[in-house]
Amino acid sequence: IGITGLNPHCESVLKINEDEKYVSEAIKSLIKKKINVKGPFPADTIFLKKNRKKYNLVIGMYHDQVLTPIKTLFEYDAINITIGLPFIRVSPDHGPNESMLGKNKSNHSSLLNAIKFLDF
């Protein structure tokens, strides 16, 4: 598992750095529980080809940090999983696109992948 930092380059000019204070501490806690996790990594480089081969899962801190590169790389095959909720939340990796409503032109791959994921 690769985890992105909160700040774009995992650094800050301030004395308090959220990536060091919170994200790194959370990663250390997961490592103590024997979870194979590394980070925090800059969100602008975690999805480079050499890094994609290292991780089966990337956890980002917010929407655009992960969904923009995932949609660029995998187009309609990706799904969105939200963690930290009291229930499982999985969705297709695209918005509703109301301009296509009723035209039977939507690509349904992401929806099918989300349903298949839930059928584990």
Residue locations for each model-derived region?
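Glycine-rich phosphate/diphosphate-binding loop of Rossmann-like nucleotide-binding domains
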Residues: I1-P40
